From Swiss-Prot:
Reaction catalyzed: L-seryl-[protein] + ATP = O-phospho-L-seryl-[protein] + ADP + H(+); L-threonyl-[protein] + ATP = O-phospho-L-threonyl-[protein] + ADP + H(+)
Keyword vocabulary terms for this entry: ATP-binding, Cytoplasm, Kinase, Magnesium, Metal-binding, Nucleotide-binding, Nucleus, Phosphoprotein, Serine/threonine-protein kinase, Transferase
Modified positions (Phosphoserine) in chain numbering: S287
The EC number(s) this enzyme carries: 2.7.11.1
Gene name linked to the record: trc
Species annotation: Drosophila pseudoobscura pseudoobscura (Fruit fly)
Annotated catalytic residues: D215
Protein name: Serine/threonine-protein kinase tricornered
Length: 458
């Protein structure tokens, strides 16, 4: 196929699509190369400034300070050497499949040269292109690079081959909140307070970085070996970058209110709703459609939304922890969507499951208009004065015992994850297209990453 471009003198110049694709790839490659140089220089300056600040706080002699500076310089040299090493799937041994999502799988793997255990997320490039997931993949990788703190699952490496994208992340053996809720049915108010507080701290931390998660749900709340929580799955996260924009919710938001009239499922008591929810929950987690149960109404409307949408999701999770099912659950996504959009009438608290007025009021403050929503004005500070969170040690909560202890027998214990006996351990692959590369492969340029701290693990 041929495409035309207009020259400066007004004449039309015709180029083949192949030529235009090559030109685009060259442009993106050069832009990323120089952007990386600037970023790396800035990161080195930040690490050096952090070291100098630490040296000022320590009572050291000048010779001791100089020794630490030399050690730091050596670490920087080792990191540059590590970055030049090409990492591939052959450097890891697959131990077990521990997760399946709509667009990929997660494996427990062991790095062959060090023996360290990681979680490897594998995404097929062809699927990402076909299902318009490139922006989501880019967003997840970029957020995991930037969000380097205790409330977000740590990514150590990202790399690619001609078929797949790979994210190498820390393995959190406690499983996820969805699995915990399916085991426990409901949590006590004390346990709910603990997990909602930790999730609030995690949400607040990414908001301070300028990101909105948009997909806060139990599946994406992972538990470490001590039972403390970390946020994961940033595929729908949005920030300030154009590459993170998405039309993910376009289909549902274009539906007319009349499309949902008369489709509401027949009323069920709370016990039947909980049983129905548990029966279908796992399948929803693995489907490409997913569930709209945790999505704020303003996200569906696409009239503009901000960080407040994550606080709505937190309120829905809090309701589920106490009731055994989310407030808007239905037999199908259309009914759920209708209930979310009509939350003033559908957010109800069944009398057969008694909860405190403080808990009820907190949920209502989360699940309300965006501009009045708890967390929408001052973030975490809004929560600290709420009676339900009375007694929470916000500064040291992660140092305290978790509400529900996690039993971990070894570094590769997967007992808190689902079993996938029918899934091969072999990394999924596909025939490489003629010519040796996937069309539009340039969209994955600059995906490769190695974290500075990883040199301590080598």
């Amino acid at each position: 196929m041929m495409s035309s471009r207009t020259d400066t003198d007004g004449s039309s110049i015709r180029f083949s699509d192949h030529t235009l694709d090559k030109a685009t790839k060259a442009k993106v490659t050069l832009e990323n190369y120089y952007s990386n140089l600037v970023t790396q220089y800035g990161e080195r300056k930040q690490r050096l400034a952090k070291l100098e600040a630490q040296l000022k706080d320590e009572s050291l002699t000048e010779s001791q300070r100089q020794e630490k500076r030399l050690q730091h310089a050596q670490k920087e040299t080792e990191y540059l050497r590590l970055k030049r090493l090409r990492l591939g799937v052959e450097d890891f041994e697959a131990l077990k499949v521990i997760g399946r999502g709509a667009f990929g799988e997660v494996r427990l793997v062991q790095k062959k040269d060090t023996g360290h255990v990681y979680a490897m997320k594998v995404l097929r490039k062809a699927d990402m292109l076909e299902k318009e997931q490139v922006a989501h993949v880019r967003a997840e990788r970029d957020v995991l690079v930037e969000a380097d703190h205790q409330w977000v699952v740590k990514m150590y490496y990202s790399f690619q081959d001609q078929v797949n994208l790979y994210l190498i992340m820390e393995f959190l053996p406690g499983g996820d909140m969805m699995t915990l809720l399916m085991k426990k049915d409901t949590l006590s108010e004390e346990g709910t307070q603990f997990y909602i507080s930790e999730t609030a701290l995690a949400i607040d931390s990414i908001h301070k970085l300028g990101f909105i998660h948009r997909d806060i749900k139990p599946d994406n709340l992972l538990l470490d070996a001590r039972g403390h929580l970390k946020l994961s799955d940033f595929g729908l996260c949005t920030g300030l970058k154009k590459s993170h924009r998405t039309d993910f919710y376009r289909d549902l938001s274009q539906a007319k209110p009349s499309d949902f009239i008369g489709t509401c499922a027949s009323p069920m008591d709370s016990k039947r709703r909980a049983e129905s929810w548990k029966r279908n929950r796992r399948a929803l987690a693995y489907s490409t459609v997913g569930t709209p149960d945790y999505i704020a109404p303003e996200v569906f409307l696409q009239t503009g939304y901000g960080p407040a949408c994550d606080w709505w999701s937190l309120g829905v999770i809090m309701y589920e922890m106490l009731m055994g099912y989310p407030p808007f659950c239905s037999d199908n996504p259309q009914d759920t969507y209708r209930k979310v959009m009509n939350w003033r009438e559908t957010l109800i608290f069944p009398p057969e499951i008694p909860i405190s007025e403080e808990a009820k009021e907190t949920i209502i403050k989360f699940c309300c208009e965006a501009d009045r929503r708890l967390g929408s004005q001052r973030g975490l500070e809004d929560l600290k004065s709420v009676p339900f969170f009375r007694g929470v040690d916000w500064e040291h909560i992660r140092e305290r015992p978790a509400a529900i202890p996690v039993e971990v027998r070894s570094i590769d214990d997967t007992s808190n994850f689902d079993e996938f006996p029918d899934v091969s351990l072999e990394i999924p692959s596909a025939p490489i297209p003629q010519g040796g590369e996937i069309a539009k492969d340039w969209v994955f340029i600059n995906y490769t990453y190695k974290r500075f701290e990883v040199r301590n693990l080598e």
